[in-house]
């Protein structure tokens, strides 16, 4: 089947987009279909999107590249999707022409907010499952999000060309979860393109057309915004009511800010300016604004004159769950780091940061992230896109501390831990869902119990796969829980988590003292039962990392004034007797006494300089979790 291509306009010259009937906007809503793909990392979502781009003819063969919609280098390198992307595709069923908007969403748990926003812009979702691996925990979480929003679900098994594929078994599993028949599950291969045409036909058949009032006041929901160095903020919207045209004034309903619309257009899959957008259409707006916070994701855009009074539901500020300090290795890079964070914030509304100083590390920023992957990717982007060298302190969650006198403190950094009598401490909890082969139940239960988890329930998805639900403190899954889970289940387990309030816990702050002085960068908040292990681990690690001095240096771990662990760095001894070739013993004794006095004085006034490498090594190995020593 070929797509009608109107070549009267732009000819398919070098880099020029192929024009088709989908390039005309104000399409009749009955001929529009909006859908997204829900899938776990590595289940072939971006590859399937690539095949759709080729099949509908919007990308020429010679311009095709793998993961076409993943724009960032880091997305392509890690093979993951971070930002939600969208594309407008032409499709014909018989003689009927349809416009399909595909919104490509991230699959990782940290980016659930990006997924929920993309779902708001759709009426249907393709549930994509790897035919060799089956459904994963995060896919399940995103599927439930889609079901809550009443989207039409089209179940699909991908990678059926793999020798290890077992489509019949996993079709049963999907049918069990979605309530459809195993025969209704479509089978495709994103790699070979098999079954993709049938999938697009099903999207047209099953996904409902968008509904909205074409004559009402304009209302459009922002589901993403990116920063372009030349054009300012590019805002991606889905029009719900009315129409949006260039050269008119628009208002953002959450902030009340008014902007001039410079350009309105569609993505197919490169941006193309258009005469406007109508009901159900997905496209982009450019207002020339330079700050992405002006166009918040989930906000409602309306006309400045005669606009809507009621915003669309669905906007909430993303809340950081994990905090970590970011410091430049070279102190003079601080302004560069500040500018870099400002620029990243333009693309990433979920990133929060404020300046902070550390005695040990100098000037830096306390940054809030959605999760550990978000933190790692932000750091990667800072280093790669802005050429910075950074130290990040070990991540921690937000604690609420209540003092004896009833005063409350919110602690995002161990150095803000209040002094004095503490009545109670509350820590954030998460509900974890682990899906794994049933032979690993014992290993998973043991791991979760060691991390202070409570079993909430257990379901068999099929005879061989089981879903375990745990409630755990978020601080316990922060470091290496995912690594430990993967190693205990030979890589077969998948994990998803969501917030679940807070609980009271017996938490303490462990300080690391060098020569009696606390080093703020190494402080950590841990459960009392794990404090001894943390203290012992850090002191022995620092003993190896800090260079020896002319005097003995004690490294101690302490809770308040109580020392729980100690290691000593032996002094370097200079051979003061080297110049005495023989001679009187009293002469030697005098030199040794003098050395002893000098060492004593040095010990009282000497300072221990901790080299940057020691900080980097201690903090980085700490944050990835300590592997048991072989």
From Swiss-Prot:
Major site of localization recorded for this protein: membrane
InterPro entries found in the cross-reference section: EF-4 (IPR006297), EFG_III/V (IPR035647), EFG_V-like (IPR000640), EFTu-like_2 (IPR004161), G_TR_CS (IPR031157), LepA_C_sf (IPR038363), LepA_CTD (IPR013842), LepA_IV (IPR035654)
HAMAP family linked to this entry: LepA (MF_00071)
Listed EC numbers: 3.6.5.n1
Reactions the enzyme catalyzes: GTP + H2O = GDP + phosphate + H(+)
Keyword Nucleotide-binding belongs to the record: yes
Swiss-Prot/TrEMBL keywords: Cell membrane, GTP-binding, Hydrolase, Membrane, Nucleotide-binding, Protein biosynthesis
Its biological purpose: Required for accurate and efficient protein synthesis under certain stress conditions. May act as a fidelity factor of the translation reaction, by catalyzing a one-codon backward translocation of tRNAs on improperly translocated ribosomes. Back-translocation proceeds from a post-translocation (POST) complex to a pre-translocation (PRE) complex, thus giving elongation factor G a second chance to translocate the tRNAs correctly. Binds to ribosomes in a GTP-dependent manner.
Domain of life, per lineage: Bacteria
Name of the protein this chain belongs to: Elongation factor 4
UniProt topology in membrane: Peripheral membrane protein
Sequence positions that bind GTP: 42-47, 158-161
Protein family per UniProt: Belongs to the TRAFAC class translation factor GTPase superfamily. Classic translation factor GTPase family. LepA subfamily.
Any GO BP annotation: positive regulation of translation
An annotated Gene Ontology molecular function: GTPase activity
Pfam families per the UniProt record, alphabetical: EFG_C, GTP_EFTU, GTP_EFTU_D2, LepA_C
Gene: lepA
NCBIfam families linked: lepA, small_GTP
PANTHER family cross-referenced by the UniProt entry: TRANSLATION FACTOR GUF1 HOMOLOG, CHLOROPLASTIC (PTHR43512:SF4), TRANSLATION FACTOR GUF1-RELATED (PTHR43512)
Enzyme class: hydrolase
Listed PROSITE patterns: G_TR_1, G_TR_2
Stretch forming the signal peptide: none
Location(s), subcellular: Cell membrane
Source species of the chain: Rhodococcus opacus (strain B4)
Annotated segments matching region Disordered: 1-22
């Amino acid at each position: 089947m070929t797509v009608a291509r109107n070549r009267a306009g732009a000819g398919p010259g070098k880099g020029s987009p192929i024009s088709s009937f989908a390039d005309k906007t104000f399409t009749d809503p009955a001929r529009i279909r909006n859908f997204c793909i829900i899938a776990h990392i590595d289940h072939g979502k971006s590859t399937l999107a690539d095949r759709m781009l080729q099949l509908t003819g919007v990308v020429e063969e010679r311009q095709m590249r793998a993961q076409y919609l993943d724009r960032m280098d880091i997305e392509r390198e890690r093979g993951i999707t971070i930002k939600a992307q969208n594309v407008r595709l032409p499709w014909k069923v018989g003689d009927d022409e349809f416009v399909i908007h595909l919104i490509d969403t991230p699959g990782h748990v940290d980016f659930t907010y990006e997924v929920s926003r993309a779902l708001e812009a759709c009426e249907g979702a393709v549930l994509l499952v790897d035919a060799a691996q089956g459904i994963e925990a995060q896919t399940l979480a995103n599927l439930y999000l889609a079901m809550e929003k009443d989207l039409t679900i089209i179940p699909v098994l991908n990678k059926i060309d793999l020798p290890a594929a077992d489509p019949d078994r996993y079709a049963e599993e999907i049918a069990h979860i979605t309530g459809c028949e195993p025969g209704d599950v479509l089978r495709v291969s994103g790699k070979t393109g098999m079954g993709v045409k049938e999938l697009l036909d099903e999207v047209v058949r099953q996904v409902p057309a968008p509904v909205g009032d074409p004559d009402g006041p304009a209302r459009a929901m922002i589901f993403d915004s990116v920063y372009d160095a030349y054009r300012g903020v590019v805002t991606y919207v889905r029009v719900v009511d009315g129409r949006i045209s260039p050269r008119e004034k628009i208002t953002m309903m959450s902030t009340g800010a008014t902007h001039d619309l410079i350009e309105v257009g569609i993505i197919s899959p490169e941006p193309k300016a258009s005469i406007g957008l109508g009901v159900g259409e997905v496209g982009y707006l450019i207002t020339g604004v330079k700050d992405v916070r002006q166009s918040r994701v989930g906000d409602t855009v309306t006309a400045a004159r005669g606009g809507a009074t009621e915003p669309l539901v669905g906007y909430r500020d993303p809340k950081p769950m994990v905090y970590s300090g970011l410091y430049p290795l070279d102190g003079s890079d601080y302004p560069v780091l500040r500018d870099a964070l400002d620029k990243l914030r333009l693309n990433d509304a979920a990133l929060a940061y404020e300046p902070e100083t550390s005695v040990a590390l100098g000037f830096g920023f306390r940054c809030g992230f959605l999760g550990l992957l978000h933190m790692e990717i932000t750091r990667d982007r800072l280093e790669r896109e802005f050429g910075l060298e950074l130290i990040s302190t070990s991540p921690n969650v937000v604690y609420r501390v209540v003092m004896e006198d009833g005063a409350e403190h919110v602690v995002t950094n161990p150095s803000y831990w209040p002094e004095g009598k503490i009545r109670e401490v509350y820590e954030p909890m998460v509900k974890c869902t682990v899906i794994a082969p049933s032979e690993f139940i014992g290993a998973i239960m043991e791991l979760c119990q060691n991390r202070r988890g409570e079993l909430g329930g257990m379901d068999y998805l099929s005879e061989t796969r089981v879903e375990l639900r745990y409630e755990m403190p978020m601080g316990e899954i922060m470091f290496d829980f995912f690594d430990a889970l993967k190693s205990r289940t030979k890589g077969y387990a998948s994990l998803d988590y969501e917030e679940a309030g807070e609980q009271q816990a017996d938490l303490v702050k462990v300080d690391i003292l060098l020569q009696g002085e606390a080093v703020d960068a190494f402080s950590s908040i841990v459960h009392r039962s794990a404090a001894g292990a943390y203290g012992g681990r850090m002191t022995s690690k620092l003993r190896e990392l800090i260079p020896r001095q002319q005097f003995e240096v004690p490294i101690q771990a302490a809770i308040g004034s109580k020392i729980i662990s100690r290691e000593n760095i032996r002094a370097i001894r200079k051979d003061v007797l080297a110049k005495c070739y023989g001679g009187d013993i009293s002469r030697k004794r005098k030199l040794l006494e003098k050395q002893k006095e000098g060492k004593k004085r040095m010990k009282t006034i000497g300072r221990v300089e901790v080299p940057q490498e020691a900080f980097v090594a201690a903090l980085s190995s700490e944050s990835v979790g300590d592997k048991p020593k072989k």
